[in-house]
């Protein structure tokens, strides 16, 4: 098994199956609409092969092929094109958002429709603002379900990696 430097520096902040189940139960009973949306983004990132938060926030409808059940996107950090198979849970989340965001450029309402992805400074600011907002909300959820660490979008990425490794998949 080969891990990238990012996974090699793993800090242990991944969710167990039980913690993921508790998070899903919290989601089902959550009445705060924005927090519920952030949880949907967390679950989408997890089910989309641990997609980075910056790629969740910059995900556009043109990147989604519902017929092939895949996501095709040039990742922001690596500038490499990836094809990610979309699981049924990921597709379900996308269907919900498609109903809410019809006619919008971006899948999730984390950045302005006018954001220029080639403007590095604007992208940096948008990413930091969105990440801070999401992670503050997720941290509250993590506390409420008794996690021993602060829940964040990055925990979705780590959790996917741990689940995949436990199923014998390679992270290279």
What are these regions (language model features)?
Residues 2, 58-99:
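Conserved tyrosine-mediated DNA breakage-rejoining catalytic core shared by Y-recombinases
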Residues 2-53, 57:
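Basic, Lys/Arg- and aromatic-enriched nucleic-acid-binding interface segment
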Residues 16-20, 87-148:
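Active-site/catalytic core of tyrosine-dependent DNA strand-transfer enzymes
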Residues 20, 35-39, 131, 135, ...:
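Short, leucine-enriched amphipathic alpha-helices that occur as contiguous helical runs
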Residues 25-33, 62, 96, 143-147:
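Conserved helix-loop functional segments at active or binding sites
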Residues 29-33, 72-85, 120-130, 148-155:
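Short, contiguous acidic/charged loop-to-helix segments that flank catalytic cores in large enzymes
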């Amino acid at each position: 098994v080969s891990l990238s430097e990012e996974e090699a520096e793993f800090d242990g902040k991944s969710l167990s199956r039980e913690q993921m189940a508790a998070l899903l139960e919290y989601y089902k009973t959550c009445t705060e609409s924005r927090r519920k949306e952030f949880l949907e983004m967390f679950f989408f990132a997890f089910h989309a092969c641990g997609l980075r938060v910056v790629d969740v926030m910059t995900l556009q409808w043109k990147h989604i092929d519902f017929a092939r059940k895949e996501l095709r996107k040039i990742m922001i950090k690596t500038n490499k094109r990836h094809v990610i198979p979309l699981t049924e849970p990921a597709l379900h989340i996308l269907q919900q958002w498609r109903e809410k965001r019809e006619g919008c450029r971006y899948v999730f309402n984390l950045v302005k429709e006018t954001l220029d992805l080639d403007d590095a400074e604007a992208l940096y600011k948008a990413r930091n603002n969105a990440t801070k907002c999401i992670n503050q909300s997720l941290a509250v959820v993590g506390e409420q379900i008794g996690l021993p660490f602060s829940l964040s979008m990055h925990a979705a990425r780590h959790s996917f990696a741990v689940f995949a490794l436990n199923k014998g998949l390679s992270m290279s």
